[in-house]
Regions:
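N-terminal mature ectodomain segment of secretory-pathway/periplasmic proteins
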Residues: 21-100, 135-136
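Short amphipathic beta-strand/extended segments with alternating polar/hydrophobic composition
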Residues: 61-65, 84-89, 102-111, 163, ...
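Gly/Pro-enriched, hydrophobic low-complexity segments
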Residues: 79-81, 145-235
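Bacterial N-terminal signal peptides
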Residues: 7-17
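Positively charged n-region of N-terminal signal peptides that target proteins for export
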Residues: 1-7
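Residue-level detector of beta-strand face positions
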Residues: 47-51, 75, 93, 139, ...
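Flexible, processing/modification-adjacent segments and terminal tails
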Residues: 19-32, 39-42, 91-157, 178-184, ...
Length: 243
């Protein structure tokens, strides 16, 4: 009986080891397909410009600025109005003309979301240090292509990431997201990858819900390692001076 239990333990340990190796292999190939961790981490700033299209027919022009470590800013223009959301690594804030037009600091939930957007590498790079738990749960068909499905868990929140089995690039993320004031299960679909400073980046991201495209972001210009001062992300001074 003791020998049987020992044998079973070895089988379980062996299966766990193989599974861990499979996950590590997928992550390694995904990082290599993007250009490798060295190239990914060599990008210190990103300035991305493009158009955001909504299901209701609205279109907004935007400039998205990201800087290491943990700084993010999104500037949008719509019908002559300028809307800003930003995070300086500690404080998340926004300016919205439809909500009074004054800079306002955001709550803890918004800080958490903005911190995720400020992560230039994505959750699959240094995932353990960032507090994620990853599990390779199998494969799935994504628009006719096989993709590896990775379950990602952090702070009781779960999402699923799909890595294309041929290109090894991120094809899709399934997660919960706030849409028009309500939480919904959405698909974030990534396509049209192009080289930026030796790193493959998607030039198109679509957010789908119940099979319908709710929003798409098309990037027309992406510049890496441009000079962006930290003040660009800081909460505006009380006199309203724009930074």
């Amino acid at each position: 009986m003791r020998n049987l239990l020992a044998a079973l333990a070895l089988v379980v340990i062996g299966a766990t080891s193989v599974f861990a190796i499979e996950l590590d292999e997928v992550l390694a190939k995904a990082a290599a397909a993007r250009g490798g961790e060295k190239a990914i981490k060599s990008i210190s700033t990103l300035v991305q410009e493009g158009t955001m299209s909504m299901a209701q027919g609205m279109e907004l022009n935007f400039t998205q600025t990201t800087k290491r470590p943990s700084k993010f800013r999104m500037d949008m223009s719509f019908q002559g109005m300028a809307i800003t959301q930003a995070f300086d690594g500690t404080t998340a804030w926004s300016v919205n003309p439809m909500a009074g037009g004054k800079p306002e600091k955001a709550g803890s939930e918004e800080v958490k979301k903005m911190a995720e957007q400020a992560d230039m590498d994505g959750e699959l790079i240094d995932w353990q240090k960032k507090g994620y738990k990853l599990e390779l749960v199998g494969t799935e068909d994504i628009d006719g292509s096989t993709a590896y499905k990775i379950k990602s868990t952090k702070d009781d929140e779960t999402s699923f990431l799909y890595i294309d089995a041929v290109t090894w690039l991120l094809a899709k993320i399934d997660k919960k997201m706030s849409m028009m004031g309500q939480e919904a299960e959405v698909e974030m679909v990534f396509s049209n990858y192009q080289d930026v400073n030796g790193v493959q980046m998607p030039m198109l991201m679509e957010i789908r819900s119940d099979g319908q495209t709710m929003m798409s972001m098309s990037y027309s210009s992406v510049k890496a390692n441009v000079d962006v001062p930290d003040a660009r992300f800081a909460f505006p001074a009380e006199d309203g001076t724009k930074k």
